[in-house]
A protein has these predicted regions:
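A beta-strand edge to alpha-helix "cap/lid" segment located at domain peripheries
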Residues: 48-109
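Short, low-complexity N-terminal intrinsically disordered segments enriched in polar/charged residues
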Residues: 1-20, 24, 33, 97, ...
């Protein structure tokens, strides 16, 4: 699988709220940097925690690129009645696994 395929699979697992499927796409030592958080979530259990904390939302893909072990996917993320923003998912890959994930947010309204 390419890095882009792994990243797409991860986003699909998040949307489906399948924490185990998302965690399996990551290295043992993965770090997830959430916007506004002081410390990253670490390890596959941190990925599972992120999915348990996430609100229900709708996503549509807008842009994606892969370059030198990094994948960037931008989505329009909507939680109806709560928020809408453009989310850029920044994946750093280690072979065919996600080693680091961070986010850039931009308002959509």
């Amino acid at each position: 699988m390419t890095g882009l395929e792994v990243a797409r699979g991860f986003i699909n697992a998040v949307v489906e709220r399948d924490a185990n499927a998302a965690a399996e796409l990551c290295t043992e030592g993965v770090e997830v940097l959430l916007p506004g958080a002081e410390e990253p979530l670490r390890g596959r259990e941190g990925v599972r925690q992120m999915i348990r904390m996430a609100p229900q939302f709708l996503q549509s893909m807008r842009d994606e690129e892969e370059h030198d072990g990094e994948v960037r996917i931008t989505t329009l993320t909507r939680a109806p009645g709560v928020f809408a923003n453009y989310t850029t998912w920044l994946f750093v890959m280690d072979k065919a696994k996600i080693d680091r994930l961070s986010f850039e947010l931009r308002g959509a309204n």
